[in-house]
C-alpha cells in the first residue's frame, strides 16, 4: 500500500546554525513526496542576520513554506545566551500552538530541534506525534542522553576535572575538557538548561540523526541497547544522513577562481564556521605555521572577538605578520570573513581541511573525502574531535586547541597530512568513508531505508491513535 503524503512542521531553535540543517531535512521530506513547513521563532531581540538568512533560504527553496512566529523575548536580558534562548522558546509555546491550530489541518507530526523540548507540551496538548531532529553526531546524542543521570553524581564539574577521563555508558572514555563548553560548570545556568533539555529529548517519539550507520557503530549500539537512559525507554533513532548543503547556485566567489588555478589536492583549507574567530596573537601564529609548512592554503579570517564591535571586517595587513601576504601571495589566499565552504571542500584542488569540528563541516568533508585537522572551538566540537580522531580516524588533532596553538604544531600537522605515509592512510580512510556515505543516501542505502521506516512508523502510530490504541 502506498504511503499517504505527510505534512511536517519543522521547528528549529534560534539562530542560523539551527535553521540550515532543518532546511536540508525539509528537502529530504520533499524528495520523498511529503510537505514541509518550517516555523521560525522570531523574538524582538533576534539577530538581524537570522532574519536575512530566513529570507535567503526562503527564496532559494520556494517549495518549502517558511513561517515567522512572533514570540516574546526572554524577560532576563542580562542572562546567559543559553538561558535567554531557552526562555524565549518556552514563551513561544502559545504562539506555536495558535499557529498549528490556524492551519487547514494539523500536521502529521512536529519535528523539533534538540533545544525545543518545551514544544513537547504543545504536541501533547494537540495529540501530535513529536520527533526530534539531532543535527550532530550519534556519539553526541549518546553522551547527551546520559549526562543528566551520571553528571550530578560526579565529585566535581568537568572544568575542575580537566583531563580526567569521564566514562559515559556505552561510550569510550572521554576527557572532561572535551565535554561541551555549556556544561563545563555543573552549577551554572547554561549547564542547568542543557541538562534539563537533554533529559526531555527521550520523551519524543523518535530521533532523526544526521549521520549514517557505518560511521558510528559504537554509539548507535549504545543507543539501541538503551544503556544511555537508565531505567527509561530510549526512543528509536533513525540515521538519515549525511545531509549537507550543496552550496546552492554557483557563488562565483574569487576564491573558487583561485582554486581552479591550483594543482589537485595541493591546498590546505582553513575555515572555522560562522562563529570561529581567533585573537590577533593566534592569527599571527596560524600565519607563521602556514608559511613554515610551505604548502598552498586558502584561509578564511574573521575579526578577533575583542575587535568585532569596532571592526566588522578584519584588517589583514594589521592582524597578520608584516610582509606575510606579500611573501605568500604565490601560494596562499586569505579571504575576509566568509567563503562558500560547501563548494570549497568539494573542489579538486583542496587536499586538507583545518576545521572547528562542527558536525555539518565534518559531513561535508566526509562527502568530499577530505582529511581533517581538528581544532574544536565551542559547543559539542570537543566531543566531535574525540570521535573523529579516536573512533572514526578521519582526522588528526591540532594540539593546544584548548588555549593556544603554536605555529610549529600547525606546521607539523599540515606536513603530516600532506606529506607523510600516515597522511596517505588518513586519505585512504576518507575515501572509504565517502564511498559509504554515498551508499547510505542512495536508493536502498541505510539512510534512505531509515527515512522510509520513519514514515512507516509514523503512519502506524497515527493509525493506532485513530483506532484508539496506544503505541
Spans of features found by a protein language model:
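Glycosyltransferase specificity loop/lid
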Residues: 1-471
Amino acid at each position: 500500500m502506498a504511503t499517504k503524503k505527510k505534512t511536517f512542521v519543522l521547528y528549529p531553535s534560534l539562530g542560523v546554525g539551527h535553521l540550515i540543517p532543518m532546511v536540508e531535512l525539509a528537502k529530504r521530506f520533499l524528495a520523498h513526496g511529503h510537505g514541509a513547513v518550517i516555523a521560525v521563532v522570531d523574538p524582538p531581540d533576534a539577530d538581524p542576520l537570522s532574519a536575512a538568512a530566513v529570507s535567503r533560504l526562503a527564496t532559494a527553496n520556494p517549495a518549502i513554506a517558511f513561517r515567522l512566529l512572533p514570540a516574546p523575548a526572554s524577560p532576563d536580558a542580562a542572562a546567559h545566551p543559553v538561558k535567554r534562548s531557552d526562555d524565549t522558546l518556552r514563551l513561544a509555546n502559545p504562539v506555536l500552538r495558535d499557529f498549528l491550530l490556524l492551519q487547514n489541518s494539523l500536521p502529521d507530526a512536529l519535528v523539533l530541534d534538540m533545544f525545543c523540548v518545551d514544544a513537547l507540551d504543545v504536541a501533547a496538548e494537540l495529540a501530535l506525534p513529536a520527533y526530534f531532529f539531532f543535527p550532530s553526531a550519534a556519539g553526541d546524542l549518546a553522551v547527551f542522553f546520559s549526562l543528566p543521570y551520571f553528571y550530578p553524581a560526579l565529585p566535581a564539574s568537568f572544568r575542575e576535572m580537566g583531563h580526567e577521563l569521564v566514562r559515559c555508558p556505552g561510550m569510550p572514555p572521554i576527557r572532561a575538557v572535551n565535554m561541551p563548553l555549556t556544561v563545563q560548570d555543573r552549577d551554572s545556568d547554561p549547564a542547568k538548561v542543557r541538562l534539563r533539555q537533554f533529559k526531555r529529548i527521550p520523551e519524543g517519539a523518535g530521533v532523526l540523526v544526521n549521520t549514517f550507520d557505518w560511521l558510528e557503530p559504537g554509539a548507535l549500539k549504545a543507543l539501541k541497547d538503551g544503556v544511555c537512559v537508565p531505567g527509561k525507554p530510549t526512543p528509536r533513532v533513525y540515521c538519515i544522513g549525511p545531509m549537507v548543503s550543496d552550496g546552492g547556485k554557483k557563488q562565483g566567489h574569487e576564491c573558487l577562481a583561485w582554486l581552479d588555478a591550483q594543482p589537485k589536492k595541493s591546498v590546505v583549507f582553513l575555515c572555522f564556521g560562522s562563529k570561529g574567530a581567533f585573537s590577533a596573537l593566534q592569527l599571527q601564529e596560524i600565519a607563521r605555521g602556514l608559511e613554515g609548512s610551505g604548502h598552498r592554503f586558502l584561509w578564511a579570517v574573521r575579526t578577533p572577538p575583542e575587535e568585532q564591535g569596532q571592526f566588522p571586517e578584519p584588517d589583514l595587513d594589521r592582524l597578520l605578520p608584516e610582509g606575510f601576504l606579500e611573501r605568500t601571495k604565490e601560494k596562499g589566499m586569505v579571504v575576509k570573513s566568509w567563503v562558500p565552504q560547501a563548494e570549497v571542500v568539494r573542489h579538486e584542488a583542496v587536499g586538507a581541511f583545518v576545521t572547528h569540528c562542527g558536525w555539518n563541516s565534518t559531513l561535508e568533508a566526509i562527502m568530499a573525502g577530505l582529511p581533517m585537522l581538528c581544532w574544536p572551538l565551542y559547543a559539542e566540537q570537543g566531543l566531535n574531535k574525540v570521535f573523529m580522531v579516536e573512533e572514526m580516524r578521519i582526522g588528526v588533532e591540532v594540539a593546544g586547541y584548548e588555549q593556544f596553538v603554536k605555529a610549529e604544531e600547525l606546521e607539523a600537522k599540515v606536513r603530516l597530512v600532506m606529506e607523510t605515509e600516515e597522511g596517505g592512510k588518513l586519505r585512504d580512510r576518507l575515501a572509504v568513508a565517502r564511498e559509504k556515505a554515498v551508499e547510505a543516501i542512495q536508493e536502498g542505502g541505510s539512510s534512505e531505508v531509515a527515512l522510509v521506516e520513519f514514515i512507516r512508523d509514523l503512519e502506524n502510530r497515527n493509525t493506532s491513535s485513530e483506532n484508539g490504541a496506544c503505541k
